[in-house]
Amino acid sequence: MANCITLNQTSYHGAGAIQSIPDEVKAHGLNKAFVCSDPDLIKFGVTKKVTDVLDAAKLEYEIYSNIKPNPTIENVQTGVAAFKASGADYFIAIGGGSSMDTAKAIGVIINNPDFEDVRSLEGVAPTTKPTVPIIAVPTTAGTAAEVTINYVIKDDEKQRKFVCVDPKDIPVVAIVDPDMMSSMPYGLTASTGMDALTHAIEGYITKAAWEMTDMFHIKAIEVIARSLRAACENDPKGREDMALGQYIAGMGFSNVGLGIVHSMAHALGAVYDTPHGVANAILLPTVMAYNADATGTKY
């Protein structure tokens, strides 16, 4: 069977990349943004960095902030109603995986109304139409949700997370601007960075891995290993390198999948609301030891 890779996206990298947003909005013929961003990012002025750019370009938007760190079915359902009422025709998702995953799920339901129950999206590509266009602006260097084909939603009632996978749902534009990450505290930088490292390591040893994805994952491991400590100290070069490293890891694992570190981390997050990167960091060494005999020369 042939190997396949999906890289259907325009991405901007580097300090000041958010200034590219108005040009992309105009290039795609978009009108009003539905800005998905969590309450803390709004409170501390991170979201405002982007809305200031929109204001300067006289672009219309509405902000939606009912987003939890592990986004829930309720976050998506209320978001669908708010999007319909807003008159928006695209998303700007500002945040970590929570904001971007919420935007993906809302957009899929908007364009596929037969899947109004978000739980029906679980699995691989059940829908016929892609999500509403998303411009993704990550504020953490970890999830790589801005470049991946999947999104994760929490079912509070059943205390589980479910994964939805569809190549049609990659954001049309990724704005990977390290200045959007400069206010991350030490602990969040470390935990999201460990999420990125886990992506790179697990993607490298999956059964679906091949030469092209190995190239992404090896480079991601190299970049993350040299830059995570510096990023935790808020070094600008460390921030920039981590932003790139986590994106490269996302390009890889989005095409070949992950492993049991992530499976167990999602379970912990669903039951205990454990921060995803923290769960990965705890589990990764034990899983690497468990997998060692099966990884050949890759370790």
Language-model segment annotations:
Residues 1-64:
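An N-terminal, well-structured beta->alpha segment
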Residues 42-115, 229-239:
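N-terminal small/polar loop signature for handling phosphorylated ligands or for N-terminal nucleophile
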Residues 74-176:
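Glycine/threonine-rich beta-strand-loop-alpha-helix active-site module
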Residues 142, 247-280:
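Glycine-rich phosphate/pyrophosphate-binding beta-alpha loops
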Residues 150-256:
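Carboxylate- and glycine-rich phosphate/diphosphate-binding segment that chelates Mg2+/Mn2+
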Residues 271-299:
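Gly/Pro-rich interdomain helix-loop hinge
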